[in-house]
């Protein structure tokens, strides 16, 4: 069975519009459908806790995505739901104690920051998107003084066009990319390389690449092709401690990313692997 890199799988935070101190953590491949389930707009789905009338309707205030697998997303979700039970979170780098059992927005934001910093998640190319301005403002305040975040971690905002009048089930502007639209051209480039049985040479070692072995990485910006292992080693060797304040590069086998050796365009490792995995279904079809 071919491993499929999920186009989108995110961990979201809901906030009750009736009781703002009540929040709910969940995960989904489709936040647009999921919030409608929580609010009862769709009969199927939802969760027992979010069905309580005194808490409905709920508003989805943010989502974290960019996980390399559904399993890693579920691990993030579970840790955020049960911060008092997880071993992933450490509070040694914060100036104020975070109440473990509090369920308010600010507490959840502090735990998200701590999770993003932890050894399991800090090298992933994660992104947090805020759908409500008050949640982003609370994030920026960083009330619990959590330390700096990984340099590749992205913070984005995507508010409704009229936030004050937007229905609770509205998810930002409605333009959140849950289908890899932003890199579809690159993924198609990878598929076409297999379909056309293109002869490729590694830019680093100049050896002939056998694309049927599934170990070829392509640059999104130029014609550069690379052996995946050699490109990973190149990127890891280029990482320096000043760029990675949490750890030592030599301890890792998976890079965060680097500049294309051919054209110097930035290559995020998560996208490189998406391209590699996009080739595999085509390879399997060619074998049949």
UniProtKB/Swiss-Prot annotation:
**What is the annotated localization of this protein?**
Nucleus
**GO CC terms in record:** Slx1-Slx4 complex
Key word Cytoplasm present in the record? no
Q: Which keywords are on file for this protein?
A: DNA damage, DNA recombination, DNA repair, Endonuclease, Hydrolase, Nuclease, Nucleus
Protein purpose = Catalytic subunit of the SLX1-SLX4 structure-specific endonuclease that resolves DNA secondary structures generated during DNA repair and recombination. Has endonuclease activity towards branched DNA substrates, introducing single-strand cuts in duplex DNA close to junctions with ss-DNA.
- Family the UniProt entry places it in: Belongs to the SLX1 family.
Name of the molecule in the record: Structure-specific endonuclease subunit SLX1
Q: Which organism is it from?
A: Yarrowia lipolytica (strain CLIB 122 / E 150)
Q: Which gene encodes it?
A: SLX1
């Amino acid at each position: 069975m071919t491993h499929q890199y999920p186009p989108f799988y995110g961990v979201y935070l809901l906030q009750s519009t009736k009781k703002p101190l009540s929040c709910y953590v969940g995960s989904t491949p489709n936040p647009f459908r999921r919030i409608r389930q929580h609010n009862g707009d769709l009969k199927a789905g939802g969760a027992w806790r979010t069905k309580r009338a005194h808490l409905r309707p709920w508003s989805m205030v943010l989502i974290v995505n960019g996980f390399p697998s559904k399993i890693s997303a579920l691990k993030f979700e579970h840790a955020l739901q049960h911060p008092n039970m997880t071993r992933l979170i450490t509070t040694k780098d914060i100036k104020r104690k975070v109440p473990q059992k509090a369920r308010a927005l600010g507490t959840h934001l502090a735990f998200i920051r701590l999770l993003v910093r932890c050894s399991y998640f800090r090298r992933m190319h994660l992104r947090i998107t805020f759908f409500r301005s008050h949640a982003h403002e609370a994030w920026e305040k960083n009330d619990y003084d959590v330390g700096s975040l990984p340099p590749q971690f992205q913070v984005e905002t995507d508010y409704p066009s009229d936030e004050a009048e937007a229905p609770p089930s509205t998810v930002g502007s409605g333009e959140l990319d849950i289908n890899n639209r932003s890199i579809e051209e690159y993924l198609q480039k990878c598929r076409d390389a297999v379909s056309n049985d293109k002869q490729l040479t590694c830019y680093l070692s100049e050896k002939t690449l056998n694309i049927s072995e599934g170990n070829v990485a392509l640059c999104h910006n130029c014609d550069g092709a690379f052996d995946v292992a050699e490109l990973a080693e190149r990127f890891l060797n280029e990482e320096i401690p000043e760029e990675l304040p949490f750890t030592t590069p030599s301890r890792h086998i998976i890079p965060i990313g680097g500049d294309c050796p051919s054209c110097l365009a930035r290559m995020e490792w998560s996208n490189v692997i998406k391209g590699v995995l996009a080739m595999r279904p085509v390879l399997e079809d060619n074998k049949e």
